[in-house]
Amino acid sequence: MWGPLLRAFTTTTWRAVAFTAFVSFVWLNHSLGGKDWEAFRDRTLAAPASHPFDAARYPFMFLYRRAPDEALYYATASAILGKPCEVDTSAIRGDSPLPPLATPGDGRLRVPYAEVPLEYPPPNLPLVVLPRLLTSAFATYAYVFGALMAALLLAACVIGARIGVRASRSPRERDEAERIFAFGLLLLAHGAISIQRLDALVALLLVLMVRAAVRGEDARLGFWAGLVGATKFVPILVLPVLLLASGVRGGKRLGAVALGGAVGLVLGLGPMIVLGQESLPMILSYHSARGLHVESTFGVLYGTVKWVLGNAEATRLDYGSFNFPGPVAGLLGKLAMPFTLALVGVVAYASRSAPVRREESQPDEDARVARIVVAALAATTALWLGGKVFSPQYLTWALPLAVALPGRAWIRVSFVLGLVVLVSQIYLRGYYDHVYNQWPAGVITMVVRLGLLGVFSRMLLVRLRPW
């Protein structure tokens, strides 16, 4: 069964692209949100026999229902453009120092960061506003936004696949098509969250960083790193790991990286600083004040210990995520950044490449590129494991990198990553209330996912340096 299906979609690269495009643009992007979803749900569940077609597709509509984050993006764009907003976003963030979005719909443009407080750095802003320029309601906005994220992911997929194919010693005839097809399967495992959040942009920028490192384009490596730092802050920590993995040494090369990074940061953060001088400190303060996320490593361990001791503690919604309250959780949250830096340091140490002597031949291209890609994956995993906040959409960052590994190693890496994202999709869309309320199924599921992430991290570290 699976053999003919695989051959059908990997005969040519274009067939694989068409499959992955269908998954991302259509299949993951077809459901409803807000009041439209509620009406569909109530109508179908009340009389399934009267709506057989809706009853048949209900499981998929439920699985891919629109996310509250998309409603928040819609309200943000509406506030900036002065357009009406029919969705209520007042409860999405929970307790938060950010004021509620005012959407008077008076047609007056408002200056982002100065008149509309935002938690999204400037590189994300065009992706939030553009779909609102093209639509008049949340339903169509969500479809356009999802298609935009799908386009970014498809581009990242093709870039990653070509990195792996071009560095392989003897690539198979359909190697690129197989990688792109596998990326579509990873999207299916990850679910609609891959196109319902802004993290597709981070995924694209990270794979562009890796491509620049592979090609030895130091200024571009720095530029993409600066831009990803301006987009999401923490992923810029992948840069020092890539510098060591790709053997960037010497003042001239490091200077080119620094210059490119400065340009990327200025272009990415400059609009925020110009439009609202207090916006950057506000965003940094906002994220530093967030509590210990229930899905983070420390959050999972803390919640598990409390549950085992018979004193399970429910989280509360604040700053847009479910976090543990209390002094112990607060202390663990403060330890998250040092822990993250330590994990990245371990990956950096394992990633360092030995300098090539003049009398030696050039290093094997397959091994060199594999080291760079695995280093990027391992550093990204370190950010997940060490972070105070670990939302499932962060897993999107690694999807294009998984298919960028040369040879056939990408298959095993993609499989384990696929298990991680599949578990995440199951609990997020199936029983997330069990997670944030710390009920048994939720606690056990989080331990299972943390274990899978540990296996994934060890697999990558062993490939870097077989201790």
List the model feature ranges, each with a label.
Residues 66, 112, 121, 293-305, ...:
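Secondary-structure junction/capping motif
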